[in-house]
Amino acid sequence: MEETQQNDQKMEFRALCEEFRANNQIPPEKFDLYQVKRGLRNPDGTGVMAGLTLICNVHGYLIDDAERIPDKGILTYRGINVEDIVEGCRRENRFGFEEVAWLLLFGKQPTRSQLEGFSKLLNSCRELPEYFAEDMIIKAPSRNIMNKLGRSVLALYSYDDNPDDPFLENNMRQAIQLIARLPTIMTYA
């Protein structure tokens, strides 16, 4: 495409954006009137509670006299500081991937026997569907690895013989297969 045509397109896109802005802006006072949070933030910048979970927590600030004060960030999985998990893995010279996956799924650290069985199960589920790596990852490159991971996860739906079954056993199978396959997908991505 020649430069003049590209410039014309840019100008047309800008004009369309202005038209869009003129007819799609919600006045800020409406958010206050209807108590709607923008971007999952309160007016003071603190996060909005969007749900309850036992899986993880992120601590990044304190509230003192209605003022948000930054604090050392702490990420916990199932009540365990992630820094402690990492330190334990370093100290014992282990990877920790399977152990953390178990912790996130089942709410407690696995016994040695549970971890061995879980690792074997993950190993048996690591293989990607035939031609998946070539067709979905290698032939469709992306500069953004998160985009590549997202696309790959969505594409796996097409290879699942029972993708919409809502029961726990099926959801567990899907979760285990995703956990097992993501490291393989990342290496191709």
Spans of model-derived segments:
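Hydrophobic alpha-helical bundle cores within soluble ligand-binding/oligomerization subdomains
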Residues: E2-A189
